[in-house]
Design a protein with these regions (language model features):
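Conserved PLP-anchoring active-site segment centered on the Schiff-base-forming lysine
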Residues: 74-96
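Conserved core segment of the aminotransferase class I/II
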Residues: 189-260, 264-269, 354
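A short helix->loop->beta-strand "cap" motif at the edges of active sites that frequently abuts
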Residues: 80, 101, 160-163, 189
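N-terminal small-domain helix-loop-helix segment of the aminotransferase-like
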Residues: 1-63, 70, 245-247, 354
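PLP-dependent enzyme catalytic core of the Aspartate aminotransferase-like
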Residues: 52, 123-124, 299, 309-318, ...
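Active-site phosphate-binding strand-loop segment of PLP-dependent enzymes
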Residues: 110-179
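Helix C-cap/helix->beta junction micro-motif
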Residues: 99, 160-161, 273, 314, ...
Length: 355
């Protein structure tokens, strides 16, 4: 597997070992219903990730997917206009479309030095019906990360036009420790930040996500909507999530080290196969969206056909760009797993024979 979007995971035993006495405490976890908004202690821990959002500004969810689904059904009405960054996690625009919203996609562009965004292009997409701007940074699948200046300019644009912002920030924390940008919910009073333990922390089995905003009334509306979804998070997951967040800096540091090591390995690989790939190293996070050179992809007909052939002939899985509704020949590669070098070596061997 070379297509993963998350980071190296931990076992329950490894997670409990981070906290003395945690195993006995975990075995005493009550298996009744949790609170609809989430366990107070866990909401307190999540709020510690933000500067302007206390526990009352945080709503826990079963994963980020539920938070996205709720937000796009509560924050906008059918017929209103939503602008979504593209390419991105499909739910961020497909749920808006399914909810009856008009949709415009704000594309990232391929440049000589990787991906970039055009803020003037974003402003041209805004209409009198626009109500919500949906962002994903660091971005899945490109690894593009909005700069601090771009974030401020987007917030100023949203404020000027009276827009809300829904920011999928599930990879936040994988930037360099001295360069982690403020969350959108901290720098814009009408922004909603989505987080999760699945991606940056590498704990998707816990199924714990959240949404945070300074708009407490909207958080209340999202809480009421959640009553028709999961109702509450599993109490064992909440107990383990508290440990993960308490030791979050160590978990994130480990994952950043894995990504950095794999980036160095990948840089050498792509230098040797420049005739096959357009190398787009991730600016932040564990995933990148690499291009396929025209002469190479022409041998297969499409990125999808190449990925299918690669999976069947070499047992290597890359994710083709058509999964993200991209016609251009791109493949997603994940840098977050400890066995990256081993898996990349299999692709290397195949390319030596077929590249």
């Amino acid at each position: 597997l070379l297509a993963q979007s998350d980071c190296e995971s931990l076992s329950i035993r490894e997670l409990l070992a981070l906290e003395p006495g945690a195993q006995e405490d975990f075995l005493d976890t009550w298996l009744g219903y949790s609170e609809n908004d989430g366990a107070p202690a866990l909401r307190e821990a999540v709020s510690g990730l933000y500067a302007q959002c206390g526990p009352e500004n945080v709503l826990l969810h079963v994963g980020a997917q539920e938070a996205i689904f709720g937000a796009l059904n509560v924050l906008v009405e059918p017929g209103e206009h939503v602008i979504c960054q593209f390419p991105t996690y499909q739910s961020l625009y497909e749920v808006a479309r399914a909810a009856g919203c008009e949709l415009s996609l704000w594309p990232l562009h391929q440049g000589e030095d990787g991906w970039y965004c055009d803020l003037d292009e974003l402003e041209r997409l805004i209409t009198s019906k626009t109500r919500l701007l949906v962002l994903n940074t660091p971005n899945n699948p490109t690894g593009y990360a909005l700069s601090a200046d771009e974030r401020q300019r987007i917030c100023e644009l949203a404020r000027r036009h009276g827009l809300r912002i829904l920011a999928d920030e599930v990879y936040r924390g994988l930037e360099a420790p001295d360069a982690v940008p403020p969350a959108f919910c901290d720098i814009y009073e009408r922004a909603f930040s989505v987080g999760v333990l699945s991606k940056a922390y590498g704990l998707p089995g816990l199924r714990v996500g959240w949404i945070a905003s300074q708009e407490r009334d909207a958080i209340g509306a999202l809480s009421r909507y959640k009553n028709y979804l999961s109702i509450c998070c599993p109490t064992p997951s909440e107990a383990l999530a508290r440990i993960a967040l308490k030791h979050g800096p160590a978990v994130l540091a480990r994952n950043r080290e894995i990504i950095a090591r794999n980036r160095r390995i990948a840089a050498d690989f792509f230098a040797r196969y420049d005739h096959v790939f357009l190398h787009n190293p991730p600016q932040a996070g564990p995933i990148a969206f690499h291009g396929l050179r025209p002469d190479f992809v022409a041998r297969f007909g499409s990125a999808l056909a190449f990925c299918e052939h690669l999976a069947q002939s070499a047992g290597v899985l890359l994710l083709p760009g058509n999964v993200y509704d991209m016609d251009a020949p791109y493949v997603r590669m994940g840098y977050g797993r400890a066995n990256f070098a081993e898996n990349l070596a299999v692709l290397d061997g195949w390319l030596q024979q077929n590249g």
